[in-house]
Amino acid sequence: MNELTTIRPSTPKDWETDQEVRWCPGCGDYAILKAVQRTMPEIGGTPENTVFVSGIGCSSRFPYYMETYGFHTIHGRAPAVATGVKLANPDLDVWIITGDGDALSIGGNHTMHLLRRNLNCQFLLFNNEIYGLTKGQYSPTSREGTRSPSTPFGSVDHPAKPCAFALGSGARFVARAIDVHKNLPSVLKAAHAHQGAAFVEIFQNCIVYNDDVFEPFTAKPNAQANQMWCTDGEPLLFAGGTKGLALDVENLTLKVIDVVDGDTSGVIVHNVRNRAIAHMLVEMPFGPFPMALGVLYDDPAPTFESAIVAQNKAAAEGKVADLQKLVAKGQTWMVDKQPHAI
């Protein structure tokens, strides 16, 4: 007689490996790792059905520290490997771990194609605005004026905007979070619940080469005034609910308005399915505006692997083709057996 075996739910400890975590003391990657390990049991994940894929960089050591299947691949190519993994076994839960340099420099083309194809996976981009592994060169997201070994007089490049890039590439889920913030697990859970490519930019502090670059909105004294956590169906408020975002109708842009006595009638209500709102949120400049955080866009569409599976199934169920007819199909001609005189 067969006995039923009760499957014990996993715990964060089940997702930890015996590997020594080799990041600099105080690196924001530690907080992200713990957040992911805490999140996995809450989403009902199982280590044997989960795959972490990374490229090259400090963040890309991530698969070594997750008790799952993993691929530490080559520079910028994590999306390509992840696509192969998902197509080989669509039932796997695939997570891509990358950084601003890995994803937006050498891997920019692969990132774009993964997002436009809408592969069902979670894409976590650790943005510290610097190359950490190669000792502090400026990255695609480094701000103008950033001094580094490769830009000793200050960078003259305009920085890439990861979330704007993702939306422009056709991503159907775009979110932002902070490495040490308590809301990071909830953002990760929302990304996992989305069916399709879920792009999450995580502001990650590099304590060695770019320390406190995000302090204007991450430091405790600045957080309330400069962070705006976006919740679907709720008004876009910040500064303790005393300010909000409204639409400047004349210029079709956003503007900041004061919220008096709790009156939010003029404030935009966040709608995660509204792509126009998402574009405005990721493009608004920090300083005059707060930093928009949380789920900015979430509008599912059919996934890449489901379309491939359906296409292959239809092809397999079709009539077997005649090879000779296929060879002779289209523009064909006979080659003269007799050589022509030159």
Tell where the protein language model's regions lie, with residue ranges:
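Active-site diphosphate/adenylate-binding microenvironment
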Residues: T5, P9, K13-I74
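Short catalytic-loop micro-motif centered on adjacent basic/acidic residues
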Residues: W23-P25, I96-T98, F173-I178
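Flexible, low-complexity linker and terminal segments
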Residues: M1-P9, D18, V208-I342
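Short coil/turn connectors at secondary-structure junctions
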Residues: Q19, T46-T50, A88-V94, R116-Q122, ...
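Conserved active-site and cofactor/substrate-binding residues in soluble primary-metabolism enzymes
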Residues: G28-A35, P47, G76, A80, ...
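Thiamine diphosphate
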Residues: I56-G132, P185-S186
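Glycine-rich ThDP/TPP pyrophosphate-binding loop and its adjacent helix/strand module
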Residues: I106-C121, F126, I130-N271
